[in-house]
Structure formats: C-alpha cells, structure tokens
Amino acid sequence: QTPLAAAGSATAVSDDLTGFAASACRVPLAESWLVGGASTTGANDLVVLANPGTVPATVQLSVYGAQGVSNPPGGSNLVVPPGERRVVPLAGLLLGEESPVVRVVASGAPVHASLQASLTRVLLPGGSDQVAPLAQADASLVIPGVQVLTTGEGQAGTVLRLLSPGADTTATVTMIPLDAASAAPEPRSVPLTAGLPTSLDLSGVAAGAYTVEVTATAPVVGAVWSTTGFGEGADFAWYAAAPAFSASGVIAVAPGVGASVVVAGGTSDATVTLTPVEGGDPLTATVGAGASIALPVGAGVYRLDTDAPVRAAVSYSADGALASYPLWPADAAASAVTVLP
C-alpha cells in the first residue's frame, strides 16, 4: 500500500470562541490516553471518539483526577457505530477537575480519540486546541517544539502535566532549547503518586522553543500546555509526546502561520531530509544527539527520511496563535484507514 498522511487546521473568531488549532490524522487505537483540558469553570472540553471501522466499537473512559481514578457512568459502555463518531463532554465525566487525564479503551474495533479544548476567562475567550492522544504510557517521553512565551501575574504560562498510572515514581524533566546558543535549564525532579495527575510550572525559563524530555522509573503519560498570554486575543496549545520515527515516512503539514517541523535527536546524530511530495527542493539538516532543531516549512505533504531514530512534531507559533501535533510514522502495511470529518 501507499503511505498516506493528512492534517487540518482551523481558526475560530467569535465572541465566545477564538484560537488556532491543528491536528493530524492517525490510525485508530484499542487504547489511548488524552492528557489535557479541564472541567473547571470556563473550560468547554469535549472527548471525541471516531470509529473508522466496519463494526461497532464499545468504549470505556476512565478519568484520573485529584481523587485518583474513576469510572464514571457517562464514560461506560459507549457504543460508537462504524463510520461515526461520538462526543462526550469532559465535565460530564468529572466535574471541577483542573488536571484530568482520560484513558480510552475500545473493544470490538479501535477508535481515534481526541480532545477538543477551549477556554473562557471571565467572558473573554482564551483560545482553543485539538489535543492529540498518546498510544501508551512510557518511562521516557519526548515532547518537541514547546513554545514558552509568557507568564501572567500569579499565573503559569507553560505547564507540564504528568501521570504515573500504575506506580509511585520520580520523573526527571529536562528542557532542551532549540536555540543552540541558549543555556539549558537545570533538570528538575518531580515525585509522582500512582493515579494522581501532577502539574509542574515550566514558565520560569527564558522565552523560546524547547523540547521537553521526561524520564521515570515507571511508565508515565504527559503533555505540556502553553499560552500566548492571558488577555484579549490569547491562544493556547497542548503539546503531546511524540513516538520514535526511525526510518522513512510521509507527513502532512496543515496550513498555518509560523509552521515548522521540530526534530528531536536520540542517542546518536541523525541526518534528516524533508522532501515535498508534489515537487520542490528537499531540505536536509543534521540534528545532534540529544539536541533539537526546527525546520520552517509550508503547508503540504512531505517525505521524512532519517538515518537514526528521532522524535518530531509540527509546531505553529504566531501572534495570537499556537498549535502543535506529534508526527507518527506511517504504517504502509496497515489496513486502509477512513478519515472522519
């Protein structure tokens, strides 16, 4: 089969909803994690379940919050018919939760899960985003392209949310600046209690773009939230962990201002080439072991080739607009995937 890649973006401009959001199509999963959103006052977040298969899927939603894990009735035995999607308000699963993490388990057929997040602060829209899923908990997370832009008075402008689902552990958080001339902040240790989400303020560093790496002694899930500000015209993004990209594949860059492909190196240097599928000059760069680079790109489909494992994401940063989505390797051997609108 021929590998496929697709991505989309949207800008909301209304009295009660603003912001830029972008996301990529990816294969459905039997299990996934949604790290992001809230169910407190001002948040209007929706869990979206799509079934591109030919048989019904039955989905169980578990929510991790300040009191541990819960299995709310509104998230039990949710049937998603083939070729359709189902939307579940996050507040209907666990009301008043500041740092929820949702585990999605599907039987009968895999589903694609995502989180539509939007925020209002005292009647002032604070942005919107589409939160990408994680396939599984892992003892090592790499989150490329996080933009640290601002801090408000008494408010954190960039926050890492972590959860260790199964065991108490300690996570080490390292921030790697994309600007090679910038000094990296000191790594930080974060104790995690099993089943309880934990937030870490990352905004006390120099403004700029970073790759956030998390290592722990037990599997964890995590994502980073960042905002352009706390006033009129603000937007935010949730940055999800990216899986390893170890060979070649096609990727899609959705339309948007300030787009770049951010590549985080692994344990060895990697030469990365982006080649426009519809023609054009390839872009080749070397990313050092443990380093990160940003490759400015326009909208389109590209072939990504690398000679060593890397992690990558598409990141957008412009005035009043933030968005990001991780790049997953295309599985050319997988069965056909139908993309739902």
What does each of the following model-derived ranges do?
Residues 9-48, 112-166, 221-268, 311-341:
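Conserved functional hotspot residues at active sites or interaction interfaces
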Residues 24, 106, 129, 138-166, ...:
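Extended, compositionally biased repeat/scaffold regions that form elongated interaction surfaces
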Residues 49-70, 106-107, 154-181, 216, ...:
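Short acidic, flexible loop segments centered on an aromatic residue
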Residues 68-101, 181-209, 277-301:
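Intrinsically disordered, low-complexity Pro/Gly/Ser/Thr-rich segments with frequent PxxP/GP/PP motifs
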Residues 1-19, 48, 52-57, 79-126, ...:
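Hydrophobic, ordered structural segments
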Residues 1-8, 261, 272-274, 304, ...:
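Long, low-hydrophobicity ectodomains and other hydrophilic envelope-associated domains
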Residues 31-40, 54-80, 88, 139-150:
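Intrinsically disordered, low-complexity linker/loop segments enriched in Gly/Pro
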Residues 218, 268-269, 276-286, 291-293, ...:
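C-terminal beta-sandwich/jelly-roll accessory domains of carbohydrate-active enzymes
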